[in-house]
A protein has these predicted regions:
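Catalytic cofactor-binding cores of redox enzymes
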Residues: 1-213
């Protein structure tokens, strides 16, 4: 396979694959390792982040909220109970913003070297999205998906159980961006479907490897 997730599942014995994926041999994608649905079968302790908040407020807005609450702390109990958490929010927002900017810089470099006009335009769109989100509120469907992916992937990288991140009610927090883009002529249904497919392909690459004694 072209990614670790595909190679990992294909390397499993057939009996092991069907233990996880079930006896339905018509489920070729799951059984052969072509794709692994994210947050479906891995663990019972799944949860969903507040993706709507990162899409609508951005890291800058969340950071400002945390800083305001830090400034307002005046009780000794809150210094112990709340201050470390709020400081962690500020650090996390800064780290996530820095991480996204690195992707923006990389996409810009790749676009400068790209000779294919279509791919060059795609890379420029990726660079523009990564330069804006998740630091700032999402303005388009593409930016909303990009911000959502940064948020969930940051959690996946931070801890092992981050692999069980649920997507939550995507229909609710993504629809306003989709509707606005379609109404204003920036997006077609086919383009939105392709962007969602790209998101799912990225999620399928998140495969856990657990060592056994």
């Amino acid at each position: 396979g072209k990614d670790f997730g595909t190679s990992f599942v294909r390397a499993l014995p057939e009996a092991t694959r069907f233990y996880f994926f079930g006896p339905d041999r018509s489920n070729v994608a799951m059984a052969t390792g072509v794709g692994i649905c994210s947050a479906v079968w891995r663990h019972s302790q799944n949860w969903a982040h507040d993706f709507a908040k990162i899409l609508n407020k951005g890291c800058a807005g969340i950071r400002a909220e945390a800083e305001a609450r830090l400034t307002a702390i005046d009780e000794p109990f809150d210094v112990v109970e709340k201050k470390p958490f709020l400081e962690a929010i500020v650090i996390t927002c800064d780290a996530l913003t820095t991480w996204a900017r690195r992707y923006a810089a990389l996409a810009t470099e790749m676009a400068a070297r790209e000779s294919n006009p279509q791919r060059k335009r795609e890379l420029e769109e990726i660079a523009a999205a990564c330069a804006h989100v998740p630091e700032h509120p999402s303005r388009t469907f593409r930016e909303a998906l990009q911000a959502q992916w940064f948020a969930q992937m940051f959690s996946r990288l931070e801890q092992n159980i981050g692999g069980q991140v649920s997507q939550g009610r995507m229909d609710q927090y993504l629809y306003p961006f989709y509707r606005k883009d379609v109404e204003e002529g920036r997006l077609t249904k086919a383009e939105a479907e392709e962007l969602l497919q790209c998101l799912w392909l990225n999620m399928m690459q998140s495969t856990e490897v657990k060592m056994s004694p």
